[in-house]
Amino acid sequence: MRSDMIKKGDHQAPARSLLHATGALKSPTDMNKPFVAICNSYIDIVPGHVHLRELADIAKEAIREAGAIPFEFNTIGVDDGIAMGHIGMRYSLPSREIIADAAETVINAHWFDGVFYIPNCDKITPGMILAAMRTNVPAIFCSGGPMKAGLSAHGKALTLSSMFEAVGAFKEGSISKEEFLDMEQNACPTCGSCAGMFTANSMNCLMEVLGLALPYNGTALAVSDQRREMIRQAAFKLVENIKNDLKPRDIVTREAIDDAFALDMAMGGSTNTVLHTLAIANEAGIDYDLERINAIAKRTPYLSKIAPSSSYSMHDVHEAGGVPAIINELMKKDGTLHPDRITVTGKTLRENNEGKEIKNFDVIHSLDAPYDAQGGLSILFGNIAPKGAVIKVGGVDPSIKTFTGKAICFNSHDEAVEAIDNRTVRAGHVVVIRYEGPKGGPGMPEMLAPTSSIVGRGLGKDVALITDGRFSGATRGIAVGHISPEAASGGPIALIEDGDEITIDLTNRTLKVNQPEDVLARRRESLTPFKAKVKTGYLARYTALVTSANTGGVMQVPENLI
């Protein structure tokens, strides 16, 4: 066993003394059992994580029952909804790397035989997956699950995106103070990840198709008995996989990454999944081209439109058959998935999901009647984004295939929000927000406040927004993010000026500023070099090492320093 490194031999008697002092080992014979880490992310201020202590206790009991010894440790977590719209958002994406580094440190320092990961919200799930790829120790994931959708006084389903859009609607005067406060109290009624197809739930669904989690991981409610039983079954399966030496890199192959993007397309997942899945591929040693994502989009139908793109919540998806029903439907179209891959169950993707039929065709459409013949995400290229940009086409009004408008440029999120709120931004504008990428932000802040204000003011069809920052999974509208290279790295988005004509072509997947190359070249000559906004602490180190979004926004040590 891997853990023999810390518990076998006379020279490790001091380590054994310390292990006995933990109280986890009940007798000397326990030293012969596998040591299993429980990588938890319990934290009081994140509603998606407040119940994870209880789930970890269930996992511990099941791991002991299966004949192994559990040891729990915790990671940090940032709630993107609470950190939104202020300097706290700079820390959200960078927290992914801290989580990966922290988990790697504990797992490798103590030579665990396996790891039970309990994530739930936005950056915690991908951070833990990065750690799993890096350490390549037998592992299983079981997230905390989604919360129930709220209910407005008018009987309308509410999610967190409803609340962000309500801010714009309230400023516009289209809803009353009483209605606004009622929504605030009822939008998030239980613990769990936010109820729509936002980043957390997108990633937790993708773990099913990647093969790292059990079926229904992405949709079973946080407060359900099914979630607690899933934790137990995952613990038993992990101990079995330790004995069989089934490792994460055996499961997460190039084909698994393809299938993750295919499910993302079918469910209209968050644009952040592109960022995180590229980072996962990078950590797994898989060279993955953005162009590949468009090829997947073209062959994958859009089957389930979930909040914020509709009124359906994750619980509705679960009741309609969950991710297994979507995977089963996609498997009926040859070439869409790679169903004979091994998964954490020890069975193939096909064996896990075959025969799981759709129970509600309003929530999950069939191949015969998709929302769209092509997937809900697109990668755009052009002279603004030579290395790519991302748009959630599933969140764009279906009548819009192209949008051409005049640029109105802002060098920060806050400047843009102020201009939208004071009505400087009008119909026909393309809002350009730059210097908000991984290096420029720093931390690639989410642009949910400006996009929600645009939609809340009733301009969702009439104003577009492009940025080198990113979006919340709750974003909808004509919103293009992840523009690469970013402005801070000298990307062409830095060259756009007010009044430039910009065209977003969703059919041909292009993003262009309609200016001659010689004009852009002259502008580049006078471009002021970017200066880091943060000079000390973690964000200073992050700024120095982070890459643009097209590589997943990962931190890389320059080759000359290795």
From Swiss-Prot:
Cofactor: [2Fe-2S] cluster; Mg(2+)
Cofactor note as given: Binds 1 [2Fe-2S] cluster per subunit. This cluster acts as a Lewis acid cofactor.
Catalytic residues (positions): S472 (proton acceptor)
One Pfam short name: ILV_EDD_C
Pathway in which the depicted protein is active: Amino-acid biosynthesis; L-isoleucine biosynthesis; L-isoleucine from 2-oxobutanoate: step 3/4; Amino-acid biosynthesis; L-valine biosynthesis; L-valine from pyruvate: step 3/4
EC number: 4.2.1.9
Binding residues for Mg(2+): D80, D122, K123, E446
GO cellular component terms, semicolon-separated: cytosol
Catalytic activity line of the entry: (2R)-2,3-dihydroxy-3-methylbutanoate = 3-methyl-2-oxobutanoate + H2O; (2R,3R)-2,3-dihydroxy-3-methylpentanoate = (S)-3-methyl-2-oxopentanoate + H2O
GO MF entries: 2 iron, 2 sulfur cluster binding; dihydroxy-acid dehydratase activity; magnesium ion binding
Coiled coil location: none
Modified residues (N6-carboxylysine): K123
Alphabetical list of HAMAP family matching this protein: IlvD
Subunit text: Homodimer.
Family membership: Belongs to the IlvD/Edd family.
Function, in words: Functions in the biosynthesis of branched-chain amino acids. Catalyzes the dehydration of (2R,3R)-2,3-dihydroxy-3-methylpentanoate (2,3-dihydroxy-3-methylvalerate) into 2-oxo-3-methylpentanoate (2-oxo-3-methylvalerate) and of (2R)-2,3-dihydroxy-3-methylbutanoate (2,3-dihydroxyisovalerate) into 2-oxo-3-methylbutanoate (2-oxoisovalerate), the penultimate precursor to L-isoleucine and L-valine, respectively.
Descriptive protein name: Dihydroxy-acid dehydratase
Organism: Staphylococcus aureus (strain MRSA252)
Gene: ilvD
